[in-house]
Design a protein with these regions (language model features):
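Glycine- and other small-residue-rich loops at beta-strand/loop junctions that grip anionic moieties
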Residues: 107
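Active-site core segments that coordinate phosphate-bearing ligands/cofactors
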Residues: 1-101, 110-134, 140-190
Length: 190
């Protein structure tokens, strides 16, 4: 979410302060699959202007530059989902077991639109939550150290007894697969 946070800082300086619900609505209304970036491209590590870095990437790869804020947001969300698919494929090659779903924890688990995009492109369920995974994990480790829970399995049972993660199932995988091919074509130019 680094790309989005940096864009938000620029927009805030320009007097455009968007809440997260507003950002999601903006992404929903933007035209899908118009432009893509590789979120891991080094140019996005700490540019003077994230919006200008995204525009330059699009220009250099022959894509239309985003103009409106909603176009930047949609580009970032779709590009993150496509990058997740690439990384998941790499993990699948080395994992000693088949990966059948993706778990998203922490703050990212609250972004329902990105989680749905991810489920669509990886064509498997995305299980989102808990959003406060670090704090919960810390509590569980302390409970284990105090002898209040026996092992990690008991920790998981306890956590699952009071938290219900959101599950996102794939939708429209055909159009997402076609868009992923376009993403691969664009990002392989760099």
């Amino acid at each position: 979410m680094w790309l989005l946070e940096q864009c938000r800082k620029e927009w805030e300086k320009a007097g455009r302060d968007y809440s997260y619900p507003a950002i999601v609505k903006m992404a929903e209304r933007a035209t899908p699959f118009r432009r893509f970036v590789n979120p891991d491209d080094p140019r996005f590590a700490n540019p003077p202007s994230m919006t200008e870095a995204i525009k330059a990437y699009c220009r250099e790869t022959g894509q239309p530059e985003p103009v409106e804020d909603d176009e930047f947001i949609r580009c970032i969300f779709e590009s993150l989902a496509f990058r997740y698919k690439e990384v998941l494929a790499l993990l699948s090659e080395i994992a000693p077991f088949p990966i059948r779903k993706l778990h998203v924890i922490g703050g990212g688990s609250m972004n329902n639109l990105l989680n749905q995009f991810t489920a669509n492109v990886i064509n498997m369920p995305v299980v989102a939550g808990p959003s406060e995974a670090t704090a919960i994990g810390n509590c569980m480790v302390q409970a284990r150290a105090a002898g209040l829970v026996a092992d990690r399995w008991e920790m998981r049972r306890l956590i699952n007894s009071f938290l219900s993660p959101a599950v996102f199932l794939p939708e429209g995988s055909g159009e997402w697969e076609e868009a992923f091919r376009k993403y691969k074509s664009v990002t392989s130019k760099k």
